[in-house]
Amino acid sequence: MFALRIAALVAAVLATGLTAGVFYAYAISVMPALNRSDDRTIVDVMQKINVVIVNPWFMIAFLGTVAFGILAAVLHLGREHRATLVWIAIALALNVIAFAVTAGFNVPLNDQLAAAGDPAQIADMAAVRANYEAAWVRYNVIRAVVHTLAFLVLCGALFAAGVQQGKAEAAGSAQGVTAYAAPAGLGAPHAAAHTR
């Protein structure tokens, strides 16, 4: 069961880290570069990116931030895992917030950009860009920061899980030693009786 709990937790860590990394890359490279481009370039490039980004590799990581977090939380229910569960719950809440930012703001902006149509046919390209770029960049930074915080908290959860497992193994070893020593101690009076 320990292996399954750790596997779910590691999956949540990886999914969150990868998703945070994607949005971080947008924030520090993709969008600053496009900001230096003309109106048609940013509209054309972002329309294409918004199509290709919806692929299994990204969706597994993006949806996994919440799905794997829920699985890890369920597997850590119980008093003995309470410390780890607190970390997981905080990270899950952060990932849900970031997910909501994407679904509530970035995706509608992407849909709005797609609805503008073929860049070659757009009459007022500057207006399309103005209604999209600044808002999208702002919400992307927010979700990148929140996912990154969730990633750090999940790393804390992984550490806490390791500490708890170490304590459990140490306690089990101590009980084993006590159980082994008890019969030897009980045998001492019998040995003394035979010497009389």
What are these regions (language model features)?
Residues 96-104:
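Mid-bilayer segments of alpha-helical transmembrane spans in multi-pass integral membrane proteins
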Residues 162-196:
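Intrinsically disordered terminal tails
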Residues 59-73:
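Hydrophobic alpha-helical transmembrane segments
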Residues 17, 70, 96, 152-155:
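Hydrophobic residues within the alpha-helical transmembrane core of Major Facilitator Superfamily
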Residues 3-7, 45, 49-56, 78-86, ...:
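Juxtamembrane loop-transmembrane helix junctions in multi-pass integral membrane proteins
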Residues 18-63, 108-134, 169-172:
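Interfacial loop at the N-terminal end of multi-pass membrane proteins
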Residues 2-16, 74-97:
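Interfacial segments of alpha-helical transmembrane regions
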Residues 65-68, 146-153:
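Hydrophobic cores of alpha-helical transmembrane segments in multi-pass inner/ER membrane proteins
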